[in-house]
A protein has these predicted regions:
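A solvent-exposed interaction/effector surface
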Residues: 2-6, 17-190
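Sec-dependent N-terminal signal peptides of Gram-positive bacterial secreted proteins and lipoproteins
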Residues: 11-17
Length: 190
């Protein structure tokens, strides 16, 4: 009986910790302009990110993490934000970390590593489908295809590659994870 109690207590603490840990990061602000039972259309304002192109996911994450940990011209530490995004650019993968909203192109520290670049992401409309579980390609591809099919059925024009948005770290329980598949779209009210 005591073992069951401690197991439940442990499980509850892990869930609570996972949830509160995920909620601690700044996210880019957006406005939902349309919603269906499968997806939503969001309008994002212009935002600043750092990005790295890679063939090996771990090295790119490390490059970006080093930048926010102080590997920049000002040796300035920058708070982590969510989501971390990835998209396919021909045969390479681009990974991006959004910078906190207090930074502008003029005030953001310059990366020390030439593999890391600052980028302004233009404002625009994005179709988004949310899912839990792991962020592996198989799960992302499944949800990305559901989103693509729904957008085609609704005659919403896709104008960019599929984007994987990851909101939680690897220690978050899969059932508690927030992942998204996104497409930049040409938005006209349906």
């Amino acid at each position: 009986m005591i073992k069951i109690f401690f197991f439940r207590l442990y499980f509850f603490i892990i869930i609570l910790f996972s949830y509160s840990f995920a909620m601690a990061y700044e996210e880019p602000s957006f406005k939902i302009v349309h919603q269906t039972d499968k997806y939503e259309i969001r309008h994002y304002q212009e935002r600043l990110a750092v990005q790295s192109t890679y063939n090996n996911q771990n090295s790119s994450f490390r490059n970006l993490f080093n930048y926010i940990s102080g590997a920049n011209k000002d040796s300035q530490k920058i708070k982590m934000t969510t989501p971390v995004t990835q998209y396919d650019n021909n045969s390479e993968i681009v990974m991006q970390f959004y910078l906190p909203s207090k930074y502008t192109a003029k005030t953001a520290p310059i990366p020390s590593d030439p593999r890391v670049t600052l980028i302004n992401i233009e404002e625009g409309y994005y179709a988004v489908i949310r899912y839990s579980g792991n962020a592996r390609d198989k799960n992302f591809d499944k949800h990305s295809q559901i989103l693509r099919t729904s957008l085609i059925e609704d005659k919403v024009q896709i104008i960019g590659p599929s984007i994987k948005a990851i909101y939680n770290g690897p220690f978050t329980l899969p059932i508690m994870r927030r992942n998204e598949a996104m497409f930049k779209v040409e938005w006209k009210k349906l």
